[in-house]
Amino acid sequence: MSSNNSNQDNFIRFALEAKVLSFGEFKTKAGRLSPYFFNAGEFNDGAHLSALGRYYSKALQESKLQFDMLYGPAYKGITLAAATAIALVDDGINVPYAYNRKEAKDHGEGGVLVGASVKGRVVIIDDVISAGTSVGESVDLIRKAGAEPAAVLIALDRMERSGNAVDIGDKSAVQAVEQEFGLPVISIANLAGLMSFLTASSDTQLTNYLPAVKAYREKYGI
């Protein structure tokens, strides 16, 4: 489930301007040569983080999902959950958020979870889903706390089948998460939206990458 076309196009434009989204030839962890690269770590100042939170907030509200709080898995998800919580307040929605530590503390407040008490319907927020491992860990922590995962909210759905350059799976990481955990995955943007954006662009530097992106999707996409 992706955001509406207007929000998606604006987000892609924003990611390009911030150099979070770039085109070229990039080797993925799976060993595939991708014509594009998305690095949310480049949203690294106050202005970008504030805008990013608004995109997450809008995608979440457009989904009409019923939720009680936000959860950010360490490490990237921590900042994303906080930024989204702040952005939601601008629309009159004040919800708590929490996150986890990579290692439990045995002093002070102790434990693995930090922030608000984890309860009710919880939205897990991250940048992308690569293998679903982080989602599985988050689901376990949330359920052990007595709460219920409601959805996963990400910035970009690559719409790419799992596996490597040779062995290609039959479904994407997002589809695997939806199937395994029974959770909807909401994305601000996805590969189909990116291709539509490139097709409609008047910038020849961008449209020149469209054939490579199209070929990549035909080979690895869902």
UniProtKB/Swiss-Prot annotation:
Quaternary state and interactors: Homodimer.
Keywords: Glycosyltransferase, Magnesium, Pyrimidine biosynthesis, Transferase
Record function comment: Catalyzes the transfer of a ribosyl phosphate group from 5-phosphoribose 1-diphosphate to orotate, leading to the formation of orotidine monophosphate (OMP).
Protein name: Orotate phosphoribosyltransferase
Pathway: Pyrimidine metabolism; UMP biosynthesis via de novo pathway; UMP from orotate: step 1/2
GO molecular function, one term: magnesium ion binding
EC number: 2.4.2.10
Keyword Lipid biosynthesis belongs to the record: no
Cofactors named for this entry: Mg(2+)
Gene label: pyrE
Matches recorded under NCBIfam families: pyrE (TIGR00336)
Enzyme category, top tier: transferase
Catalytic activity reported: orotidine 5'-phosphate + diphosphate = orotate + 5-phospho-alpha-D-ribose 1-diphosphate
Positions that bind orotate: F37, F38, S130, R158
